[in-house]
Regions:
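Glycine- and acidic/polar-rich repeat regions and solenoidal domains
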Residues: 1-234, 331-340, 355-381, 388-548, ...
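Extracellular polysaccharide-degrading/modifying enzymes targeting complex plant/algal/animal polysaccharides
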Residues: 8-14, 30-31, 158, 244-266, ...
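Short coil/turn segments at beta-strand junctions that form active-site/ligand-binding loops
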Residues: 112, 190, 292-294, 313
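C-terminal accessory segments
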Residues: 156, 226, 230-260, 270, ...
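C-terminal amphipathic "assembly/sorting" segment characterized by alternating charged
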Residues: 198-274, 284, 295, 304-311, ...
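Acidic Gly/Asp/Thr-rich repetitive segments characteristic of extracellular carbohydrate-active
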Residues: 267-305, 567, 572-584
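Beta-solenoid repeat scaffold
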Residues: 295, 304-332, 340-352, 382-384, ...
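Acidic glycine-/aspartate-rich tracts in secreted/extracellular proteins
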Residues: 301-302, 321-324, 512, 536-539
């Protein structure tokens, strides 16, 4: 939380605070609830009047969670603010009689950029301009919520007596009525008016999405310009002119302290200085002394390390020759990771073998690549063409995100994981079931997994919190051979992904005692499992019936050279024709 108006004392009520001409700068996705940029009140003070005015502020890329400005009290005014590329909304979350007017929302098509979300009664929303917002559902340009019957104050009270007029929506993906409808939220909005609004979007056939009954909404005198003529009560197709937006200088004028440059900084490109390293060199010292953006090139050979290679800056570590992978082996006296990513770390690692075999008289490596504890900054990780082998303890993993750490993106491709007792890829440390998760964007592509006792892929986002949009998970063209056949085991354990694609994967003699895929998803989450092959493998277990799409296959795989761990399908085989399993590199 950046700024809170606290109302926990009678003297705090009807405060008539003014929050104006401030600059709220970039805030990255947090991966959990509690990352609002501004909040006025709490659910316990929802029906108390704050009378706070929030005006003439600039919010730029404030994307901590879905609620950029969270209103949880009554009789507030939010006006003349600009939200620029914020992945979130102004949320009238609790409280009545709030006013949102003359604000400018600019998304520039950025994912999850949103506008205004409406809960509770008596609000007025007018003269706002919303342009290029790409968010859906809770991140919509306009989301008018369904409510919970007989709701507790901290849940969802019915939208009643809300007036929305003279707003302009240009190239916004989603205007939605009945947002959040499910088995709990079943009360549609009532006594709501949507009048004199303009909607321009040549990519849409209809102006809004009705998630629930809209009988309680009066549509009147709205003008639309869509992909084709649209005629419905309250809407007419007319040629309308999009509003002229202010230029960048005008948006930033008089926002923030006079001495502060109120613009998201674009860091200068790092100089990619190269460091050529031979076996026998102390890798930890090379990494410590390397400049940010440096490229550490390892010659063929074995690199024993006694403690973790500590990555707290942008670095690339790669093999000098991809065909002759350097081998990193742990021989420390105390268990440690081979690589630890810390605050400031952005790592690319290519064509390296991590061998977890136990050295006589030495400790085991806890992980090939993992993170420090309690990181503040998000990190990024790209692992390409690497091998992870011989990690012999069940609690020690090849790649792992630890609790209280968060990755903006993790990309793992063209890798081999073999002979592991623990998980291969584990981003499942946040098990408090409050919506936290360890990585926002994950891509796992063209990887092989052979002879694993643990889970090849384990990703967890527990609970029912709806303040975030991730994780976004894509798993494609992977092959799993002799993996996790124990009772109640899973090849993939995917709990709570909000956007998921699993496609073109091959399961060979895997998950027999449990499942190939164990997916726990909500009805509204965008999940898709398609074009996979299951040979002598377990079933797919999902919470809803919507995840598995299209045909699944049951062909005996034939590989180019399984003895050398090359699980690419033989040319001309059924899997190769169907583009299932590994792609040729």
């Amino acid at each position: 939380m950046t700024l809170i108006v606290i109302l926990n004392d009678e003297r705090c009520l009807e405060n008539h605070h003014r929050i104006d001409h401030n600059y709220f700068g970039e805030r990255p996705v947090y991966g959990s609830n509690g990352a609002e940029t501004m909040r006025v009140g709490t659910s316990q003070q929802a029906y108390s009047s704050s009378n706070t005015v929030i005006e003439n502020n600039l919010f730029e890329r404030c994307s901590g969670e879905v609620e950029v400005i969270s209103i949880k009290s009554s009789d507030n005014i939010i006006r003349n603010n600009t939200l620029l590329e914020c992945e979130g909304v102004v949320a009238l979350r609790h409280g009545d009689r709030n006013t949102v007017n003359d604000n400018l929302f600019i998304g520039n098509g950025r994912r999850n950029t949103g506008g205004i979300r409406v809960v509770n009664a008596g609000h007025q929303i007018y003269d706002n301009v919303l342009v290029g917002l790409a968010g859906t559902r809770f991140f919509s340009a306009l989301g008018v919520m369904d409510a919970v019957p007989n709701s507790l104050p901290n849940r969802y009270c019915q939208v009643v007596d809300v007036k929305m007029y003279r707003n302009t929506f240009v190239d916004c993906t989603n205007i939605e009525f009945g947002t959040g409808k499910d088995m709990e939220r079943t009360l549609a909005p009532e006594k709501v008016s949507f009048t004199d609004n303009i909607i321009i979007n040549k990519g849409l056939d209809q102006p809004y999405i009705a998630v629930d009954d809209v009988a309680g909404i009066q549509f009147k005198d709205n003008k639309v310009q869509l992909a084709k003529n649209y005629s419905a009560p309250g809407f007419t197709t007319e040629k309308v002119k999009a509003p002229q937006l202010p230029d960048d200088a005008a948006i930033r004028k008089d926002k923030g302290a006079s001495w502060f440059k109120n613009q998201v900084a674009h860091p200068a490109a790092n100089v990619h200085k190269e460091y050529n390293v031979s076996p026998g060199t102390n890798l930890s010292e090379v990494i410590h002394s390397a400049e940010p953006g440096g490229v550490i090139i390892l010659a063929k050979g074995t690199y024993p390390i006694q403690r973790a290679m500590f990555i707290d800056k942008p670095l690339t570590i790669r093999a000098a020759d991809a065909a002759n992978k350097p081998l990193v082996r742990f021989n420390g006296d105390k268990p440690d990771n081979m690589v630890t990513i810390a605050d400031g770390g952005k790592m690319v690692i290519e064509n390296i073998t991590f061998d977890g075999v136990l050295e006589p008289g030495k400790a085991l490596a806890k992980a090939g690549i993992s993170t420090a504890f309690d990181m503040i900054q998000p990190y990024t990780l790209i692992v390409d063409g690497c091998e992870f082998q011989n990690f012999g303890e069940g609690g020690f993993f090849a790649i792992k995100g630890t609790k209280a750490t968060f990755a903006e993106s993790v990309t793992i491709r063209n890798c081999l994981f073999r002979d592991l007792s623990g998980d291969a890829i584990n981003y499942a440390a946040e098990k408090d079931d409050i919506g936290r998760y360890n990585a926002d964007d994950m891509l796992i592509e063209n990887c092989s997994f052979y002879r694993l006792l643990g889970l090849p892929i384990n990703i967890y986002r527990g609970g029912s919190d709806e303040s975030t949009a991730g994780p976004y998970i894509t798993i494609r063209h992977c092959t799993f051979v002799d993996c996790c056949n124990k009772e109640r085991g899973s090849v993939m354990r995917l709990i709570g992904p909000q956007v998921l694609t699993v496609e073109n994967c091959n399961f060979d003699n895997s998950g027999r005692g449990g499942a190939t895929i164990r997916l726990d998803e909500a009805t509204w989450e965008k999940v898709r499992i398609a074009n996979c092959n299951l040979w002598n493998s377990g079933r797919m277990m999902t919470t809803t019936s919507q995840a598995i799409q299209g045909k699944m296959y049951n062909f005996r795989p034939a590989y180019i050279n399984a003895e050398a761990y090359d699980y690419t399908p033989v040319e001309g085989s059924e899997l190769e024709k169907l583009s299932i399993g590994l792609k040729k590199k």
